[in-house]
């Protein structure tokens, strides 16, 4: 039996053969065809050979990001992203304009809703941080809105005449010939002399039109496609007609009571508590139908629950002039003594009264921003008032014939119906009042005007008169872009139903209607102080008052009576010094304000005597 020789001098030791590593199979898309591809092909990072070079020592102050033991979130980098560094795209090219698109400052300010000039000096740190976060969110929202405004492709148009041409002399036939076919189809006349005169109302989307004739004719139609929705005869006089929150419900003020119809002409409700109604207005965000009557009552009907919210006795006789302020939902009523009163369902007395004319008020209209109010009276005066707290007339014009109907467009155009003539005045823009010097457009109708309204989101003016209905083209009257989530003219039936549910959930209570809606978000300081005073009287002490200083007990004879009194006096002196320093700063600020010269004033040589007299406590007139 042979044995293996032992390793010795002549026999080399036996070694194990190294096993060849199995290569990972490569796919056809991972194959390397050229040396360049091999050099640039992605693969696992190669380990660098260690060299004898030592790494530079790390400074002790260097921050090392460590993973938290309590949170699974990765550590957040405190450094802001550097937008200035060029970013590389998928194609390998560098972006020449890195970062987000800069928003124009003017557009961002237009969308900002927070006034940063008002600060809370003595607010808590938690409250201050919440305010700062809200301001940052509001600023970000305004910047995004300014960037999104670039997507609004539609722009408002306007009618511009040739050199020396008066636009008031341009006829409707000339405008129809100059515009496209789709816009020309929006101008039409309805000859309905047998049932006139007519009142009219457009829906909030601007797609549907409701007509109500004095002799009982009621009709609703899609005026864009000329498709008739319903047509009935109520067999009694119709005084006014108005759509509710959607085109599916229609309110008709008939001779005796108020009726509600659907879009098929079926009578749904007869509201007998609203009798002898003369005018109708609907508040869309509150779901309130405001009615005025011959008996002098202003009634608010909640159409969501079918109940009367309030019935106010105006004590001014017959009410036939009413308008709504779209900004704050306040109702404006015109009276026979020349005054206009402002009403809210939360108050039984008028919020304000404005003396506008020497005679009775015939018509009232308020623009879409709630800034300007136009009135016309029996004295043939047309006036525009400023509603921003002053209620002062800005401009006035004497008309050859008193205007019986007024209306504002979405972009601030003012129309007045005088007999069978319609005059339109335009201003410098939406935020400026219309100029009453020269009319923008003029049109003569086949009958006396009985109702006026601009169509939302369309450059169209609807006029109801004794001969029927006329649709006029008014360039630059409406907003070119609409909010698809609020008023969408192209919405389907399902979208309308979804919008109704959301609108009912976001319904604003009637008690919140006031002149200044922004006051709802402010702090009621008077009520807060009154509650604090009542709390102090009830408890017998002020729980929020600062506690008296109580020195801590010390050892080794430092808590003697003299030491305690000395420490208390030191704290009292410090508080007294702070109060004196604060009062001196207030006096210096007041003195600077008193000595500040008005803009445009020149310094005088006698000003030095005025300063000395004020410092000495004397009263000297400059």
Swiss-Prot record:
Keyword field contains Phosphoprotein: yes
- InterPro entries linked to this entry: BING4_C_dom, WD40/YVTN_repeat-like_dom_sf, WD40_repeat_dom_sf, WD40_rpt, WDR46/Utp7
Instruction: Report whether Nucleus shows up as a keyword of the record.
Output: yes
Ranges where the record places region Disordered: 1-135, 547-622
Alphabetically sorted, this entry's keywords are: Nucleus, Phosphoprotein, Repeat, WD repeat
Top-rank taxon: Eukaryota
At which residues are the WD repeats? 192-233, 234-271, 314-353, 356-395, 398-435
Biological process according to GO: ribosomal small subunit biogenesis
Where it mainly occurs, coarsely classed, is nucleus
Q: Which Pfam families match?
A: BING4CT, WD40
Give start-end positions of Basic and acidic residues composition bias.
Answer: 106-118, 571-582
Give the Phosphoserine positions (modified residues): 41
Q: Where in the cell is it found?
A: Nucleus, Nucleolus
Q: Which residues form a coiled coil?
A: none
Entry GO terms, CC:
nucleolus; small-subunit processome
Q: Known PANTHER family for this protein?
A: WD REPEAT-CONTAINING PROTEIN 46, WD-REPEAT PROTEIN BING4
| Self-association state and partner proteins as the record states | Part of the small subunit (SSU) processome, composed of more than 70 proteins and the RNA chaperone small nucleolar RNA (snoRNA) U3. Interacts with DDX21, NCL, NOP2 and EBNA1BP2.
What's this chain's function? Answer: Scaffold component of the nucleolar structure. Required for localization of DDX21 and NCL to the granular compartment of the nucleolus. Part of the small subunit (SSU) processome, first precursor of the small eukaryotic ribosomal subunit. During the assembly of the SSU processome in the nucleolus, many ribosome biogenesis factors, an RNA chaperone and ribosomal proteins associate with the nascent pre-rRNA and work in concert to generate RNA folding, modifications, rearrangements and cleavage as well as targeted degradation of pre-ribosomal RNA by the RNA exosome.
Q: Which protein is depicted?
A: WD repeat-containing protein 46
List the source organism: Mus musculus
